[in-house]
């Protein structure tokens, strides 16, 4: 008989909505049903929360196939149809009345990975997996992550930030300053988006304005970042006060860089676990991942991403993802599996860590 009721919270208002559904479905398929009773809660694009049959219908969708074969508008309309099919399934934050023991929020991006849902759960005294408010907010902002990481002694890529208002006031002046400061090619990145949403690698001066416009569509702060010519290495970290790092993995992008399409649609990227590196370098990357995890005060779990620069061999921090993907092709669960913790064990460990945080 299950000993804990787990609220699996998925969906959300970010551009990674569909990826969250895929992650949640994978978790639902791997959770130990003898130990845990699953209570799915779906958060729609509009922020409305749904439980029961409505949440289960969304969870049952074949979202990978829909992403590959269906337009975004059609997917959104189908989700709306399900959401409003039965108003009795609206969820009104009655966690205690529903007997929720612990929450597993798997909402990627804004509202789910930036401290907002963590703060909500804290207010209702519901234990939850992953990082708390402070670490979630810091790691969601790429600039804040860089500041903290550099202070802790990690290497970061040279960058600058541009605010949307400044750009709107004088776009040409901003473009000119960036082109003077950075050697092509360089990256334009929204400060607080995941899954490579809104990112452009700028190769020619005439591409910059469009790249900025694209990034400002999803954020009010944008990073301009030097391109690091090197290998993309990722590490899964798990734990609270005594975190452990997985064997590092390597991403070999199918295109110019590891973008949303590469990650979730065409599958052209090659993934290598363990990364094709000498043992001493693998160990050093894992050590740097733990250093970054602690510097940003992470708990529960995070995926820490690096570049290893070809010219210098430097291990350069790219970003920290506090709610990594849990899809069938996501690096976090695959790296943990390669380190001896399979998907079901990983879910169990995350839930136990959540309860451990509350007790401590």
Curated annotation (Swiss-Prot):
Cofactor stoichiometry and binding?
Answer: Binds 2 magnesium or manganese ions per subunit.
Stored InterPro entries:
ATP-grasp, ATP_grasp_subdomain_1, D-Ala_lig_Van_CS, D_ala_D_ala, Dala_Dala_lig_C, Dala_Dala_lig_N, PreATP-grasp_dom_sf
- List, for all copies, the residue spans of the domain called ATP-grasp: 146-352
List, alphabetically, the Gene3D superfamilies matched.
3.40.50.20, ATP-grasp fold, A domain, ATP-grasp fold, B domain
Q: What reaction does this catalyse?
A: 2 D-alanine + ATP = D-alanyl-D-alanine + ADP + phosphate + H(+)
Q: Which cofactor does it need?
A: Mg(2+); Mn(2+)
Q: What is its main location?
A: cytoplasm
Which top-level group of life is the source organism from?
Answer: Bacteria
Q: Please give the biological process terms from Gene Ontology that the record holds.
A: cell wall organization; peptidoglycan biosynthetic process; regulation of cell shape
Q: What are the protein's UniProt keywords?
A: ATP-binding, Cell shape, Cell wall biogenesis/degradation, Cytoplasm, Ligase, Magnesium, Manganese, Metal-binding, Nucleotide-binding, Peptidoglycan synthesis
Q: Which cellular compartments is it found in?
A: Cytoplasm
Describe which pathway this protein belongs to, using the record's wording. Cell wall biogenesis; peptidoglycan biosynthesis
Residues the record lists as binding ATP: 179-234
- Annotated Mg(2+) 2 binding sites: 319, 321
The record's disulfide annotation reads none
| Pfam families cross-referenced by the UniProt entry | Dala_Dala_lig_C (PF07478), Dala_Dala_lig_N (PF01820)
- Documented EC number(s): 6.3.2.4
MF (Gene Ontology): ATP binding; D-alanine-D-alanine ligase activity; metal ion binding
Q: Which NCBIfam families match?
A: D_ala_D_alaTIGR, PRK01372.1, PRK01966.1-4
Q: Which family does it belong to?
A: Belongs to the D-alanine--D-alanine ligase family.
Name the record gives this protein: D-alanine--D-alanine ligase
Which species expresses this protein natively? Prosthecochloris aestuarii (strain DSM 271 / SK 413)
Read off the lineage from the record.
Bacteria, Pseudomonadati, Chlorobiota, Chlorobiia, Chlorobiales
Gene name as annotated? ddl
